A protein has these predicted regions:
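Signature of N-terminal electron-transfer/Fe-S-associated modules in redox systems
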Residues: 1-116
Length: 116
């Protein structure tokens, strides 16, 4: 039903929960998943910051949160903590309590802006 956000992907650059989307609806569209975030062996700054900040535990929610955070930073390179929390509200995590996730996203945003 798309309630937890773990299935988040970008469809033509728009963040969507993929589990309620039929394959026919995605035909001919650009689909971006967490697997496309890295460049070869070079991790995306969001992926690196998640590791640095220990922002994952079981990992179930991580792909969806990373894709959602990437979508946020594509629209807003300098989000406030409140904006990050609001943007990721559709992604549920039962392990981390979100603070480490928020710090990781804020750190990646700073790095991508060249402010880190």
């Amino acid at each position: 039903t798309g309630d937890c956000g773990a299935c988040s992907v970008l469809v033509d650059g728009v963040l969507v929960c993929s589990c309620p989307v039929l394959g026919a609806e995605a035909q001919g569209k650009k689909i971006e998943t967490v697997e496309g975030m890295s460049s070869g062996s070079e991790l995306h700054p969001l992926q690196r910051k998640f590791i640095e900040h220990a922002a994952l535990q079981c990992g179930f929610c991580t792909p969806g949160i990373l894709v959602a955070a990437k979508a946020l930073l594509a629209q807003n390179a300098n989000p406030t903590e409140t904006e990050v929390r609001y943007w990721l509200a559709g992604n549920l995590c039962r392990c981390t309590g979100y603070d480490k996730i928020i710090r990781a996203v804020m750190g990646a945003a700073a790095e991508l802006r060249g402010a880190a």
